[in-house]
Amino acid sequence: MSNARQRELIREFLAVTSATSAAAETYLERNHWSLDHALDDFYTQSGGGGRAEQYSAELVATFERYAAGGAMDTEALVRYVGDLGFQLEDVATLCLARLLKVEELTADISRFQFLSTWHGLGCSSLPDMRAAVDALELRLRTDAAYFRALYAYTFGLGLDAGGRRLSVETAIAYWSLFFLDHTYAVTVPAPRLRSWFEFLRAGDHSVSRDTWDMFPRFAQRFPDDTELLEHYNELASWPLVIDEYYEWVKGRNQL
């Protein structure tokens, strides 16, 4: 587990307890960095009868409808997403995953993750949660900063366990979600998107974090081939695969 993730768990522990940072780290370490187990340990040791947050019975019941052993596994998450009225491939589902701090698609959602998130938003039922996620999806249409945050988050979500690069087909699927319909605050011209997909599929490529992050900026800077061929600078700090794409476009235009 990364140091950044450990610090995040310590902050979450402190948010619902009166413990010191040192105590939070001790409880988390001896419970193998499981936040739920560490919190249960803390309240057992301190003699407290319950956690600082009092979650509504309706919210707890909503969680327990899907949870087994104190967590929602992948199968339960699929049912939950469906009951909210979304498909796994919807952008709204990405909004939901980021809201719940899901780090990878196969990771369980803990009781604390689920309850603290929805409690903080004042949501306890499926209709409440659906409305909150709908609002986030709507925000993508006008809030470029939120769009970029979700876009950046999605790269990590799409990685295979232990992987550092997206497969071409996974990256294309996500790019299609974000850019194909031109409905969100950040757009990519359709011809550039189609050409980019064709190039990636024609070669032996995978997609790095740098390429993922830079592609929207590149596509906006060079919206058509005329602009690209006249003004692209191979000495600029674009990822290597974008340099290769430029050469590919140049070669096609010389035929």
From Swiss-Prot:
CDD domains hit by this protein: UBA_DCN1
SUPFAM superfamilies: UBA-like
Segments forming domain UBA-like: 6-43
Pfam families: Cullin_binding, UBA_4
Molecular function in Gene Ontology: cullin family protein binding; protein-macromolecule adaptor activity; ubiquitin conjugating enzyme binding; ubiquitin-like protein binding
Gene Ontology biological process terms from the UniProt entry: protein neddylation
GO cellular component: ubiquitin ligase complex
Matching InterPro entries: DCN-prot, DCN1-like_PONY, PONY_dom, UBA-like_sf
Top-rank taxon: Eukaryota
Keywords: Ubl conjugation pathway
Domain DCUN1: start-end pairs: 54-250
Function: May contribute to neddylation of cullin components of SCF-type E3 ubiquitin ligase complexes. Neddylation of cullins play an essential role in the regulation of SCF-type complexes activity.
Protein name as it appears in the record: Defective in cullin neddylation protein 1
Organism: Eremothecium gossypii (strain ATCC 10895 / CBS 109.51 / FGSC 9923 / NRRL Y-1056)
Organism classification: Eukaryota, Fungi, Dikarya, Ascomycota, Saccharomycotina
Annotated gene: DCN1
